């Protein structure tokens, strides 16, 4: 068979609309999906997609071993990396030395302006868990970022009269970090050689191609957050992509800096290896707490001894979460990079000062625990949390970071799966909360919203994933509720899901609660395999395939 030129656009199809109409900024999708940009992402896809698929297969082999009762281990093959005390990552970019408070949110125009106008140090703009990957969200997200870094977003909300423009006068503007979608995601609106393009490569490639050189001209660089990895070879894959991408644009290797989210159980056994794989490009590791909890439930779902109680009892102070944090901070600081803390998802409660004060105190305690543990910065989901979080970090970490603080802790293989929670209980309230959060988040996601306020918390896919997998594992193991003594069965949970979906749908025209309920019930009833991710489970419902775009008409 003749080899395909990796940069040719033969056998490439675009099935999403490539509009020439601006929405809330100056650029349009036609400025993003140019022929040269398309060639660039197609080259990366053709070069690396087979490796990506093999690594996803490897995840399933790990799951099969865990299902058979095996345990996770530190890898023998990479012992030499862990035990070598001498190697360190290259120094990070000067603009990333101080990351005390990071704000996160999807790349829609309003969120981008609000984030840049908040006096945080860094802003993670998110194509992943806080963004429903509709074609419009993804392509206009790229448009918005292109215009934001060039200071070309300026619009007025007609309904409120509020003007949205980034304020750059006399202040330090937050440094932007981009999170592409994870390795498990594809985008069905672009086909390469008959298969959907890797969503990770699409998100990374379009942003890097259009913006890397401009960012360098501003004294910045292309910075990324890398999500959902489960093996150090997945980090090696990112490193290989970074090297090729930089070579293609004639940018020095090591220019890109990337922070890896440690949000899966298997990769917590390979932290040294992840940093080593990305040592020229690393900006540290981050504790993705909710996804980590979800991954722990998912990977250990067939081991009854690891069933977790109601989600509100699974805090950062329980053994397996505490041990993962200690391990991450120790290894990051040993290798000379940042160890970032997790998300405070609280939303200020404007109409109840007493409840709001209690919520802010909980945030303060959470951030105090993080900074005293040794974290170099933390995440917030709402600008209203900035004063609370910042005051804690300024008081206890007056330096830009605390990488110099080395803690001598030894975490064993068993410590990372110590899911014993004294007095942990599974209750009707916990069941109901999981159903309510799961349904409401899934329904919003199906309508194109990936970041949803529920019960005074800003929920993204990670918290809904915890709900989904807890319901599944409680049903699978026929757990008895501690408060009622009733056994949790698929029939019982399905009935509750239907009742809650009906309640939620009342007075909400054009809602998608039935689709959400059906998806949730299929897994619980064993009619389908447990999906690796909610986003892959629901993705086909948001795909909007249109007429094939004439590629010769692109810029």
Curated annotation (Swiss-Prot):
Indicate the family of this protein: Belongs to the malate synthase family.
- Give, as in the UniProt entry, the pathway in which the protein acts: Carbohydrate metabolism; glyoxylate cycle; (S)-malate from isocitrate: step 2/2
The name this protein carries in UniProt is: Malate synthase, glyoxysomal
Read off the NCBIfam families from this record. malate_syn_A
**Which UniProt key words apply to this protein?**
Glyoxylate bypass, Glyoxysome, Peroxisome, Transferase, Tricarboxylic acid cycle
What is this enzyme's catalytic activity, as reactions? Answer: glyoxylate + acetyl-CoA + H2O = (S)-malate + CoA + H(+)
User: Where does this one sit in the cell?
Assistant: Glyoxysome
Q: State the gene name recorded for this protein.
A: MAS
Matching entries from SUPFAM superfamilies are given as: Malate synthase G
The UniProt induction remark is: By ethanol.
Organism, scientific name: Pichia angusta (Yeast)
Where, by residue number, is the active site? 179 (proton acceptor), 460 (proton donor)
Q: Name one GO molecular function term.
A: malate synthase activity
Q: Transferase: present as a keyword of the record?
A: yes
Q: What is its EC number?
A: 2.3.3.9
Q: Which PANTHER family match?
A: MALATE SYNTHASE, MALATE SYNTHASE 1-RELATED
Q: Which Pfam families match?
A: MS_C, MS_N, MS_TIM-barrel
Class of the enzyme per the UniProt entry, highest EC level: transferase
User: What's in the GO CC field?
Assistant: glyoxysome; peroxisomal matrix
Location (main, coarse): other
**BP terms from Gene Ontology:** glyoxylate cycle; tricarboxylic acid cycle
